Amino acid sequence: MIKQTLREFARSNKTIFLDDFMKIAHQDKKSGYYTTKKPIGKNGDFITAPEVSQIFGEIIAIKIIEKINQLNVTQFNLIELGPGRGSLMMDIVRVLDNFLDKNIVNYSLYFHEINKFYINKLKTIFPDSQIKDEFSDYRNQYTIFIANEFFDALPIRQITKRNDIFFETAVKINEKNKLELSYVEPRKESLEYIN
């Protein structure tokens, strides 16, 4: 299903730049990897530190408590980007709720998640939380972001240099109607940060 979406995009655009390819493959609403599958956990494709041990989340919670005490913060946003099944935040919240005096310090819990299965699970586990898809939707107050393995899944642009010529990685359809890597002239904006 996702291959068909990618082929159609490649046919209409000649090539798919790597960042567009990754965005479609990961985030397509109908068949994207992170939007339609359950990739995390024993029955998924990978596990993350919070799935193995609660100590990772507990250490993060202790650092949060240290920081808000140091800065005398009484209200803050706690936002997790790409929380998956919510394992990390369960560990963090458990420690925060045990050690923060709710009469003095309050936090608003938010998630930035695109997977429909995980969104439903998060709503069940954290009924007082909010799930957002725009960064402008958060309260304007002290904010702590948690992003365990979130950036690993973001689309990237890849530039290579061969014989003093820059190329940008893309995907195209070959003569056998298969998707294959290609190295093409970079988009102008892709070269802006290269000296």
Sequence positions of predicted segments:
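Class I S-adenosyl-L-methionine
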Residues: 7-8, 20, 139-142, 146-195
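Rossmann-like AdoMet
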Residues: 1-81, 85-129, 133-134, 138
